[in-house]
Amino acid sequence: MAKETFQRKKPHVNVGTIGHVDHGKTTLTAAITKVLAEAGGAKFRDYASIDNTPEEKARGITINSSHVEYETDARHYAHVDCPGHADYVKNMITGAAQMDGAILVVAATDGAMPQTREHILLARQMQVPAIVVFLNKVDMLGESDSELLDLVEMELHELLESKGYHNSPIIRGSALRALEGDPKYVESIKQLMKIVDEAVPTPQRETDKPFLMPVEDVFSISGRGTVATGRVERGVVKINDKLQLIGLGDTRDTVATGLEMFNKILEEARAGENVGILLRGLTKTDIERGMCLVAPGTCTPHTEFKGPVYVLTKEEGGRHKPFFSGYRPQLYFRTTDVTGTIELPAGVEMVMPGDNVEITVKLIAPIAMEKGMRFAIREGGRTIGAGTVSEILK
């Protein structure tokens, strides 16, 4: 008898709380779970359980972050909250928490602070499509302070506009008072989630995107031809589909003449599946690990790009010393290392362990590259940093 399939009745969306330290990100996360738990859409998580974050590893970097889940009438959400500022930077740059939208928490008593700005900039660099603002701690201001609130809102709108976030909605409330059950502030949490439902776009499913599979291994089957194996990153491939092999050399056209998974023949392979693809007209020497099989014309090979990186501290297993322009590490993309030369921005003399900085990179060989793609920086096989491609130059 066939196994039952898991029914996804609602679209799934990933969100996260961002903002300056002590502006109430974790308290808001707790308040959302409490208010939605009362409506039957979540399990209440108190502040302490969210704040006590487990360590996780992403691309060799240790990150502390808490994941909670909840449902509104319209959607199922996975929500990430990070305790420390460095954890946010690492989380966003390594893509440990891919966000479809962010809830920016700003204390009305402070307004926009340095980390508020930095998190908005990071969200933009990481292509987070939408930001909804929760103006927290409004209960600490008197009724006469409504002009101050208007000023804070104006400043936030200007800041968000300058980073390309137009018409970001702002909801006023108090996460702490909502946690305490004050009806007025519970209502502001309900309003916030209604706005998040509307303002954060539903992400396109991975299977709806054009096909891409990074090659992990290659072997020949006598009498059949050459097989490339790997995990399908996105999209769908069917037998007899035309494909392109790109990266590390010249682009080659081919056709998928057969598909296998666990020695079973497939009609099609979908995002997330580990498969072998039999390729027409290619020999084993034409293909190597690190190349990508893609739907024709959907992805191109490049060697030069810009992007933000986070450099690990010594304690995190990173370098003990700074590096300078002209530094030549390995850059690990998808399934392979490629040597690249790093140039620092004008006015930046060196990068210390623990810094995050925007770098320009020239690779010695082209790879299938796209905006938003993640990479690790490695030295002698260990990860010493991680980054994201924010702009392709060549």
Curated annotation (Swiss-Prot):
Any one Pfam family match given in the protein's UniProt record, by short name: GTP_EFTU
Superkingdom field: Bacteria
Keyword vocabulary terms for this entry: Cytoplasm, Elongation factor, GTP-binding, Hydrolase, Magnesium, Metal-binding, Nucleotide-binding, Protein biosynthesis
Keyword Transit peptide: no
GO cellular component terms listed in the entry, alphabetical order: cytosol
Gene3D superfamilies: P-loop containing nucleotide triphosphate hydrolases, Translation factors
Region (G4): 136-139
Region named G5: 174-176
Binding site for Mg(2+): 26
Annotated compartments: Cytoplasm
Segments for region (G2): 60-64
EC number: 3.6.5.3
Domain tr-type G: 10-204
Residue numbers spanned by region G3: 81-84
Enzyme class: hydrolase
Residues reported in the UniProt entry to bind GTP: 19-26, 81-85, 136-139
Cited PROSITE patterns: G_TR_1 (PS00301), G_TR_2 (PS51722)
Catalytic activity: GTP + H2O = GDP + phosphate + H(+)
Gene Ontology MF terms in the entry: GTP binding; GTPase activity; translation elongation factor activity
Region of interest: G1: 19-26
HAMAP family (alphabetical): EF_Tu_B
Quaternary state and interactors: Monomer.
Family: Belongs to the TRAFAC class translation factor GTPase superfamily. Classic translation factor GTPase family. EF-Tu/EF-1A subfamily.
Chain's role: GTP hydrolase that promotes the GTP-dependent binding of aminoacyl-tRNA to the A-site of ribosomes during protein biosynthesis.
Protein name (database record): Elongation factor Tu
Name of the gene: tuf
